[in-house]
Design a protein with these regions (language model features):
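A short glycine-rich beta-strand->turn/loop micro-motif centered on a GG-aromatic cluster
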Residues: 159-164, 184-197
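Internal catalytic-core helix/loop-beta-alpha segment
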Residues: 113-159
């Protein structure tokens, strides 16, 4: 598990600009979605992964706890699967130019729909009534990457909780673009994973300063449970 380290100076800057440390702690579960990014064998399974992130295996219990809490409180769980499709290989050719032919070939073999690498990691607590969205860019919200935004809008979602791998690429890209599309956005500090602590923390810090909130799993679950209980009490009156 990553050692999360957010400098006090960063927290002070956030409080100075927003008035408090956490601006999205008052979660409305019914309007909240957990977005789990790229927790696939192509990133987690040795011998299959084209870009192995061993830290991602460590966050699986927290991802499952979050998914359970979101469902129980009345929210939505969405599993994002990265895909290398013929269309995306053509329309996003600059990615392959940057990676080079050998790495590009490994990624294509690992991330093609129908392959072992494309499948979600077996240890995830996936339920049949969860939602599944395929994306073809780092960000799930950028134009042409997926239908995630339309799916969320159709359900009245205005808040997204970001978990998954890797923190500083697909998770941060998705989180930043979620905020730019006017979703309240939270990155979960101990339910995202990168290759190193340094990359993980740098990503969280950059996001926290300008794009949204960051919270540990326990805090997110506490916020969900508190408002779910309030909603039940109100309905019973």
């Amino acid at each position: 598990m990553h050692k999360v380290s957010i400098p006090q100076s960063v927290i002070d800057d956030v409080v100075a600009s927003r008035g408090r440390e956490h601006v999205f702690e008052n979660l409305d579960p019914a309007r909240t979605a957990l977005i789990v990014v790229d927790m696939q064998n192509g990133f987690l399974m040795r011998g299959v992964a084209h870009a192995l992130c061993e830290e991602a295996i460590e966050i699986v219990p927290n991802v499952n706890r979050l998914a359970h809490a979101v469902r129980r409180s009345g929210g939505t769980v969405v599993w994002i699967q990265n895909a290398a499709t013929p269309e995306s290989l053509q329309s996003w050719s600059v990615r392959d130019e940057m990676d080079g032919p050998e790495r590009s070939a490994r990624r294509t073999a690992s991330m093609a729909p129908g392959t072992k690498g494309y499948e979600l990691w077996a240890g995830l607590g996936v339920k049949s009534d969860d939602l599944f969205v395929q994306k073809t860019r780092f960000s799930a919200f950028i134009q042409g990457a997926s239908n995630l935004e339309a799916v969320l809008r159709s359900r009245g979602i205005d808040t997204v909780i970001i978990a998954g791998t890797v923190t500083n690429v697909c998770c941060e890209s998705t989180a930043r673009d979620a905020m730019m599309r006017n979703f309240k956005t939270i990155m979960v500090t101990d339910a995202n994973a990168a290759e190193t602590d340094a990359l993980h923390n740098a990503s969280l810090i950059a996001f926290y300063l300008k794009f949204g909130d960051i919270m540990p799993t326990d805090m997110v679950i506490g916020c969900l449970n508190a408002n779910a209980a309030t909603a039940r009490d109100t309905a019973a009156e």
